[in-house]
Amino acid sequence: GAHFTSRDIIYLMSDLLVAGDESAFTGDGISKTVYDMTMGTSQMLTCMEERLKQMDADADVTVFGQEFNPFTFGIAKADMLIRGGDPNNMQFGDTLSDDKFSGYKFDYIISNPPFGIPWKREEKEVTAEFKKGTAGRFAPGLPAKGDGQLLFMLNGLAKLKDDGQMAIIQNGSSLFNGDAGSGPSEIRRYLIENDWLDAIVQLPNNA
């Protein structure tokens, strides 16, 4: 389901995202974009922005987020206003069925999407986009309808710049669910064959 993410885990994700990227923060006019597809109250975006500013206080960091829960969305948008950012970068809606950032590409993506939640509500829109092939986000395959977390991963991959990095939290089922040739298996094959997986970090129970 939807989960609160501790600051320790967010800072670990932030550090992993920028590891080896220090050279990108030398010189003037540094500009970076950060996206969270299930931003909640936007704490991941805030922590990532803080981390990038530690690397270069003068860097122009622009954050973007989408959230389906109206309560947490309101908090995220208010926080953006308080911090002097652009509230229009905070969008309300279901990321899977109503993508508010279609066509966008980001430097960094950080997210803790819900897992173990069916995507039956979004089935019509997701299936239609899958049929578009590479013109959509879900061309590699569709997971079992009982768990949509791999759809969020595909959404993130579709929004990365060529040199972009993504840190995303998933439960263990993403590693082994589905027989060979099934949707989940094809998604994993897509990741491996394109060399898009740098690391898997197993978090402790109840982290």
Can you annotate each of these PLM segments?
Residues 115-118, 122-146:
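Conserved catalytic motifs of ABC-family nucleotide-binding domains
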Residues 61-64, 136-140, 203:
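Short beta-alpha connecting loops at secondary-structure transitions
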Residues 44, 68, 130, 138-142, ...:
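Aromatic-residue hotspot detector
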